[in-house]
UniProtKB/Swiss-Prot annotation:
Gene: ERECTA
CDD domains to which the protein is assigned, alphabetical: STKc_IRAK
Effect the entry attributes to changing G489D: In er-117; compact inflorescence with short siliques and pedicels, and susceptibility to P.cucumerina
A Pfam family the protein falls into: LRRNT_2
Loss of function: phenotype: In er-104 and er-105, small curly leaves and compact inflorescence with short thick siliques, increased canalization of rosette leaf number during long days.
Protein name (Swiss-Prot/TrEMBL): LRR receptor-like serine/threonine-protein kinase ERECTA
Domain notes: The kinase domain is not required for ligand binding.
Family: Belongs to the protein kinase superfamily. Ser/Thr protein kinase family.
Binding locations of ATP: I654, G655, H656, G657, A658, S659, S660, T661, V662, K676
Main location: membrane
Modified residues (Phosphothreonine): T645, T823
Extracellular-facing ranges: 25-580
């Protein structure tokens, strides 16, 4: 008995020693893996060799309860750099490896194929390169292989078909080439195949439908050719079929109607022929997108049977015939886009039954007849575009019922009659375009009640009467075009209240009076009042000097400073007889003035505070106080600043904007500062403004410009900032130095720095701060071309208790969030939109708004034919080694500028994506762990595998890890 007990004890001790040996080896393996990482934020601080350290409690490590073998390694979204160590193959018991959302580079090690128990491998959203190793095919237990959003090259290994349990294969957004291996189509358990955004060629194999369990098939944005297989109707398990943005030709096969997919995306190919009527039998369709092809014939009336379809995109084809009235039966329809075809006939009144319709676009067709009153029953209609047709009749007065409408474009038709007063009751309208019609009568003064209006175009009509003074109430307006009408009378004085207006076109009318009422419109950049009957002097102050003579020609009585202007004509000498009484009055007045001068000379002299930058205009206000916030400004007083800048003389001006002028001042210590003089002399709440400035003075970040001092006065407020010698990003891109080559690495560094500064304001300040005016001119550059945001938080700090919104300041045209017009609120996502426009500027070296073109609209117009990369600045293509990264930054910019704020990423997410693009030899500066995502916001987009019938395609874009997942999808969903 004792002998048996001893044997058992020895066996137990042996097992313990064996377990201790194994566990010791696994801990050493983990430390070996750590050596290959560059732990920027020291997130793996607990991975140490300390004797008391238990690797099973290390961050991201999970162990089996009995053997203590490592079974899961989850290091996702930790900002890890470096490579994946070959030592990972020594962890034989691993069931799951999740390294997604880092900045890992190098190749996937062949040794990963030694993890024989592995079921889940997710290396997505990194910078991994090289081929997909064939050794992965040895992982016979593997169920999920997710390698999307890397830089993998080469063909897809056909040996992946040898993994018997593989359910998810996601290789999207890489640089894979070659054809799709036909053997993959014979994997009966495969449920999800994501291959979008690669360089795959060849045809779509008829064997596709051998994948009897496949519900998600996505090959969007490749270079696939040939036709859609005739047998496609046999793929009865499909829920999502996306073949868009390839080079597919031929007709849409009849058998496609046997599919029961929720999403059918065929847009952006070269498909021809007619739309098969059998598509009208696909009752499960939620999204049908056939746009951007060569489809002809008429729209099948049977599509009206699709009562569960929410989005119908047939635009940019060659469709003819009329719009079927049966479309009015699609009761769930939200988006109906039929624009850019050859449709004829009328808009059927049956469309008025679509009470959930959000967007109706029939622009650029040959439609005629009146615009039906029945559309006023579409009470949720947000956007109506009928531009470029042959519509006649009058503007329906019933449109006043469309209270949700923000965009109304009736331009370039044959519409007659007056502008109905009822339009002024569409309170949320931000764009009203009635141009190029035959509208007559006067402009209703009640249009001045449209407080959210951003753009109004009534040009090229037969409008008479005057410009309503009520237009002065359009405080949000940015563009007004009344040109080429018969408008008379003066330019109303009330227009000087339009502090946000950028464009004003009044040419070719019969206006009289002068242009002095526009002198205070400081943000005005496009002005044309030519060919009217205006008289008087053109103002020389403020911003009128920027306008060319062409803006004023054709006004014989208008006096300007250009050649041949009446100002330069020889003027007749006018003889005036002066009475003795007048001479006596002048003499007495002169004596009084002389007496006042003598009294003033006897008083103690103090340096006068500035007024309009003049040295000879003393005023009676007391000297303002200079509040010092930085040691750089120590020992300075207000009088010092006035003396050093000669009372803010014009010769010290280094820039100006819509609300301020910026001066350069060299301090006593020979260090320069930038002085921003605000135009507003009477802040509504000086005390509140001072409180905000005190708060802003505490904000310090390497990518933010520091506030060094301030001076508040009813004469005008001064803000003192760091002076940055390289000026603004706008100067670098569009200013006198724009001929200078700007390489890709520098652009990426600037984009990353600006994003870090904005992310700090949004996520690390308490209370959080909305910038409200993100634009290239508010991104300054230091001597190393490091980006630093300026002008942040001046208006109002973000109030967390009020839904993080504020309406105090509007942004700049071209950069402003379109959602602002509907809500009158700016949020963090408004800053994200503006930042996206800045990214587009960096990528194209084009201005956000240039003359009458809009950069975002221009980019969007190039997306349908995959021509976006053609917009890239040539300096990028000549200095960037990997144009795939440029394409991804385009994707990121389009994500930032999505119309719906909830679809945009956060600035933390933006910084993480841009950080992943930075060159490994020049890593970005480390950020605090608080500046990274506190926890993974990743939403498992494959979670519907067990219940494929419940797939919700829209939810797939909600994942934090999908910030730049699908180039084509970003384009198609970024509707204007």
């Amino acid at each position: 008995m004792a002998l048996f007990r001893d044997i058992v004890l020895l066996g137990f001790l042996f097992c313990l020693s064996l377990v201790a040996t194994v566990t010791s080896e696994e801990g050493a393996t983990l430390l070996e893996i750590k050596k290959s990482f560059k732990d920027v934020n020291n997130v793996l601080y607990d991975w140490t060799t300390s004797p008391s350290s238990d690797y099973c409690v290390w961050r991201g490590v999970s162990c089996e309860n009995v053997t203590f073998n490592v079974v899961a390694l989850n290091l996702s979204d930790l900002n890890l750099d470096g490579e994946i160590s070959p030592a990972i193959g020594d962890l034989k018991s691993l069931l799951s490896i999740d390294l997604r959302g880092n900045r890992l580079s190098g190749q996937i090690p062949d040794e990963i194929g030694d993890c024989s128990s592995l079921q889940n491998l997710d290396l997505s959203f990194n910078e991994l390169s090289g081929d997909i190793p064939f050794s992965i095919s040895k992982l016979k237990q593997l169920e999920q292989l997710i390698l999307k959003n890397n830089q993998l090259i080469g063909p897809i290994p056909s040996t992946l078909s040898q993994i018997p349990n593989l359910k998810i294969l996601d290789l999207a957004q890489n640089k894979l080439s070659g054809e799709i291996p036909r053997l993959i189509y014979w994997n009966e358990v495969l449920q999800y195949l994501g291959l979008r955004g690669n360089n795959l060629v060849g045809n779509i194999s008829p064997d596709l439908c051998q994948l009897t369990g496949l519900w998600y098939f996505d090959v969007r944005n490749n270079s696939l050719t040939g036709s859609i297989p005739e047998t496609i109707g046999n793929c009865t398990a499909f829920q999502v079929l996306d073949l868009s943005y390839n080079q597919l030709t031929g007709e849409i096969p009849f058998d496609i109607g046997f599919l029961q997919v929720a999403t059918l995306s065929l847009q952006g190919n070269q498909l021809s022929g007619k739309i098969p009527s059998v598509i009208g039998l696909m009752q499960a369709l939620a999204v049908l997108d056939l746009s951007g092809n060569l489809l002809s014939g008429s729209i099948p009336p049977i599509l009206g049977n699709l009562t569960f379809t929410e989005k119908l995109y047939l635009h940019s084809n060659k469709l003819t015939g009329s719009i079927p009235p049966e479309l009015g039966n699609m009761s769930k329809l939200h988006y109906l886009e039929l624009n850019d075809n050859h449709l004829t006939g009328h808009i059927p009144p049956e469309l008025g039954k679509l009470t959930d319709l959000f967007d109706l676009n029939v622009a650029n067709n040959d439609l005629e007849g009146p615009i039906p009153d029945h559309l006023s029953s579409c009470t949720n209609l947000n956007s109506l575009n009928v531009h470029g047709n042959k519509f006649s009749g009058t503007i329906p007065r019933a449109f006043q019922k469309l209270e949700s409408m923000t965009y109304l474009n009736l331009s370039s038709n044959n519409i007659k009659g007056p502008i109905p007063v009822e339009l002024s009751r569409i309170g949320n309208l931000d764009t009203l375009d009635l141009s190029n019609n035959k509208i007559n009568g006067i402009i209703p003064s009640s249009l001045g009640d449209l407080e959210h209006l951003l753009k109004m175009n009534l040009s090229r009509n037969h409008i008479t009467g005057v410009v309503p003074g009520d237009f002065g109430n359009l405080r949000s307006i940015m563009e007004i075009d009344l040109s080429n009408n018969d408008i008379s009378g003066p330019i109303p004085e009330e227009l000087n209240q339009l502090q946000n207006i950028i464009l004003l076109r009044l040419e070719n009318n019969n206006l009289t009076g002068n242009v002095g009422s526009l002198a205070n419109c400081l943000s005005l950049t496009v002005l044309n009042v030519s060919h009217n009957n205006l008289v008087g002097d053109i103002p020389k102050n403020n911003n009128f000097s920027r306008f060319s003579p062409d803006s004023f020609i054709g006004n014989p009585g208008l006096c300007g400073s250009w050649l041949n202007s009446p100002c330069h004509d020889s003027r007749r000498t006018v003889r005036v007889s002066i009475s003795r009484a007048a001479i006596l009055g002048i003499a007495i007045g002169g004596l009084v003035i002389l007496l006042m001068v003598l009294i003033a000379a006897c008083r103690p002299h103090n340096p006068p505070p500035f007024l309009d930058g003049s040295l000879d205009k003393p005023v009676t206000y007391s000297t303002p106080k200079l509040v010092i916030l930085h040691m750089n400004m120590a020992l300075h007083v207000y009088e010092d600043i006035m003396r050093m800048t000669e009372n803010l003389s014009e010769k010290y001006i280094i820039g100006h904007g819509a609300s301020s002028t910026v001066y350069k001042c060299v301090l006593k210590n020979c260090k320069p500062v930038a002085i921003k003089r605000l135009y507003s002399h009477n802040p509504q709440s000086m005390k509140q403004f001072e409180t905000e400035l005190e708060m802003l003075s505490s904000i310090k970040h390497r990518n933010l410009v520091s506030l060094q001092a301030y001076s508040l006065s009813h004469l005008g407020s001064l803000l003192f900032y760091d002076y940055l010698e390289n000026g603004s990003l706008w100067d670098l891109l569009h200013g006198p130095t724009k001929k200078k080559t700007l390489d890709w690495d520098t652009r990426l560094k600037i984009a990353y720095g600006a994003a870090q500064g904005l992310a700090y304001l949004h996520h690390d300040c308490s209370p959080r701060i909305i910038h409200r005016d993100v634009k290239s001119s508010n991104i300054l550059l230091d001597k190393d071309l490091e980006a630093r945001l300026t002008d942040f938080g001046i208006a109002k700090s973000l109030c967390v208790s009020k839904s993080h919104t504020s309406t105090y300041v509007m942004g700049t045209i071209g950069y402003i969030d379109p959602e602002y017009a509907r809500t009158s609120r700016l949020t963090e996502k408004s800053d994200v939109y503006s930042y996206g426009i800045v990214l587009l500027e960096l990528l194209t070296r084009r201005k956000a708004v240039d003359d009458e073109s809009n950069l975002h609209h221009l980019i969007m117009s190039k997306t349908g034919n995959n021509e976006v990369m053609e917009m890239a600045d040539p300096d990028i293509t000549s200095t960037c080694k990997d144009l795939g990264v440029v394409k991804k930054v385009f994707q990121l910019a389009l994500l930032c500028t999505k119309r719906q704020p909830n679809d945009r990423p956060t600035m933390h997410q933006v910084t993480r994506v841009l950080g992943s693009f930075m060159l490994s030899e020049q890593p970005p500066a480390a950020t605090d762990t608080s500046a990274t995502l506190a926890g993974s916001c990743y939403v498992d987009e494959y979670a519907n595998l067990k219940t494929p019938h419940s797939v919700n395609c829209s939810s797939m874009s909600a994942s934090d890890a999908q910030l730049f997942l699908r180039f084509g999808q970003v384009i198609s969903q970024n509707s204007e």
